[in-house]
Amino acid sequence: MPSVFIGKSDNQDFILNSSMMNRHGIITGSTGSRKTVTMKVLLEEFSKLGIPSFVADMKGDVKSLGLKGSENEKIIERLKLLNMDTFDFEAFPVEFWDIFQEKEIPLRCSISSMGPIMLASVLGLNEVQSAILNSVFKIADEKGLLLKDLKDLISMLNYVSENSKEFSKNYGNMQSQSVLAILRSLKMLEEQGGNLFFSEPEIDLNDLFKKNERGYGYINILSCEKLITKPSIYSAFLLYMLSYLYETLPEIGDTEIPKFAFFFDEAHMLFDNISKELLSKIELTVRLIRSKGVGVFFITQNPLDVPNEISSNLRTKISAEIGRASCRERV
């Protein structure tokens, strides 16, 4: 069975067997504890096994995976510590993506694909507004209308508002103040660059599953230096991607080597102020997506950043350092 060497402590090797890779994991530790280094090791080793992956690059640290490294004093010292005589430097196949379409390959998603639950989270809607948005999606579906971009959704909201009496029989009262609040939130999202993200053509799943001539899986890197300043768009897109994989990939059951790996950096951003409905959807997706051959890894400072409903599904737990007893218990 293939395995990945993660590190060593007190002459004990830490190995991750490939059969555990689709049972998900978490990497925790404070700033400077080498969480990103650990993540990059996993990305490299997964690539060698032919496993494509998707990772959010928060500070530009992951881009170097596409370049061949070179030896220096720190690396020599590290090799001695690990009792490794040699180390082969190599560049890994990478693909760069960008929601804001500034430098890399554009990443797009239609409003219909995002769905009302995740979109309500992006917009920060309350319970009443979320219910109205959900009704608008249902009405559009009944009328065979595809909501491709923000303009489509705005037009649909205005249409429903203007004909509220007609729809109130089946969907309840849709107060104009609530509709206006949703429209204001959409306007703010548009100003943040949401009009670039919510458009077509959408990403093709096959573009993420590529391998190079050596059989190495591509590491798909999402540029997040700008995206990190838009936490609602960041969290919504990554959750959409996870749902997209789950809904699109066929069932394959437990496999010796997973088909794909997904890395959520700054995982706390996914769960800040999350609704119970969306959390329940994420928990279900994480629990079931392993049968699609997908491994999911969360990277964050504190293991308590990840809700218990999610962390209970994570079998591989790597911690650089843990201070509080409550954190140690979670890991």
Which residues does each predicted region cover?
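Post-Walker A alpha-helix
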Residues: 38-39
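The conserved Walker
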Residues: 27-31, 303
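A short helix-turn-beta junction within AAA+ P-loop NTPase domains corresponding to the substrate/partner-engaging
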Residues: 309-321
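P-loop NTPase motor domains
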Residues: 43-52, 60-287, 310
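Pre-Walker A (Motif I) flank of P-loop NTPase domains
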Residues: 12, 20-25, 216-220
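Conserved small/polar residues in nucleotide/adenosyl-binding loops
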Residues: 325-331
